[in-house]
C-alpha cells in the first residue's frame, strides 16, 4: 500500500507540473492507459492472496479516481490559460478607426449614358433598342452607304459572314424604328458599337447614342436648338458656345460636325483642345431622302434630323479623363473616384 501511495504522490506531482495539454495527455496514458501503471496494478491483483484482493482493488480504484480528478482539474486550468493567451493575441483595439462599408457605384460610362438619356428624355425623346449583331442592309444599305464605301472595308468592320456583322453604329436602330411605325418619331438609341480601331482615343468596342426626330416642317434650326439645349445642360454651362461645321455623312444631307467651346480653358486654348479653343463632340444633319425612301416615308411631306455622339468621348470631357482605355481596364482605383 505504501508503494501505491508513493505512486499517487508522484502522479499528482507530475500532473501539477504539466505545462500544456499534450504533456497532460501523456501522463494520462502513462498512469491510466491500457498499459498504464495503475492499470497494471489492477492486473496484478490475481497474484495476491484471496483475502487481500478486495481491499487492494478498492485502493487501486480510489487511486485511479484521484489521478483522473487531478488530470481533469489540470486540463481545465491549462485550457483556460491557453484560451486567455489566445484572446490576448486576438484582442481588438477599440480605439482604432473602423473599417468603412465598401460602397459600389455606377461605371462612369453608365453614368454618362443615364445622364444623356435623362436630358434628352426631358426634350421628349424616347429610348429605342436594336440588335448588336446586324445585317448588311440595316447597318449600311438602308443608311445610304453604298457597297464601295470605305466603312464597309474588312479593316473597319467586324464581319461574321458576308451578310452578318457587329454593328458599327446605332443608326440601324433608327431604320428599324421607322420601318415599324409612322411619323412623327422622336427617339434616341444608346448602345454598344464595334469597329476595328484601338488607341488612346479609340476602342474596338465603345458606346454611342444616336438621335432621330422626324415630323412635318422640321428644319436645321430645330436641330441646332435641340443640340444647343442638350449640350448646355450636359456640361452645366448655360452660356456654352457651339459651332456647326459642314461635314459629310452618307445618311444625312446637309451634314455637320458640332464643336463646343473648350470646357477646360473657356476657349483660351489648352492641351485638351489642342490650343484651338474648340472641342468636337458629335456629328449631325438632316435625314437623307434616300434613307426615307428605304423605309417608305414620303420625304416631300416629312423631314427630320439625326445626330450621333460617342459616350466615352462625352465622359472624357465631363470627367477630365485623357485616356479612353481607362474606362475598360477595370482599375478599381480609377473607378472608385466615381462611386
Curated annotation (Swiss-Prot):
CC cofactor note: Binds 2 magnesium ions per tetramer.
InterPro entries linked: aa-tRNA-synth_II (IPR006195), aa-tRNA-synth_II/BPL/LPL (IPR045864), Phe-tRNA-synth_IIc_asu (IPR004529), Phe-tRNA_ligase_II_N (IPR004188), Phe_tRNA_ligase_alpha1_bac (IPR022911), Phenylalanyl-tRNA_Synthase (IPR002319), tRNA-bd_arm (IPR010978)
Keyword presence, ATP-binding: yes
UniProt keywords, alphabetically: Aminoacyl-tRNA synthetase, ATP-binding, Cytoplasm, Ligase, Magnesium, Metal-binding, Nucleotide-binding, Protein biosynthesis
Keyword Nucleotide-binding included in the entry's annotation: yes
Root EC class: ligase
Superkingdom of the source species: Bacteria
Localisation: Cytoplasm
Molecular function in Gene Ontology: ATP binding; magnesium ion binding; phenylalanine-tRNA ligase activity; tRNA binding
Native species: Thioalkalivibrio sulfidiphilus (strain HL-EbGR7)
SUPFAM superfamilies: Class II aaRS and biotin synthetases, tRNA-binding arm
Binding annotation for Mg(2+): 253
Name of the featured protein: Phenylalanine--tRNA ligase alpha subunit
Family: Belongs to the class-II aminoacyl-tRNA synthetase family. Phe-tRNA synthetase alpha subunit type 1 subfamily.
Subunit: Tetramer of two alpha and two beta subunits.
Catalytically driven reaction(s): tRNA(Phe) + L-phenylalanine + ATP = L-phenylalanyl-tRNA(Phe) + AMP + diphosphate + H(+)
Enzyme Commission code(s) on record: 6.1.1.20
GO biological process: phenylalanyl-tRNA aminoacylation
Gene this protein is translated from: pheS
A cellular component annotation (GO) from this entry: cytoplasm
Pfam families, alphabetized: Phe_tRNA-synt_N (PF02912), tRNA-synt_2d (PF01409)
Cofactor(s) needed for function: Mg(2+)
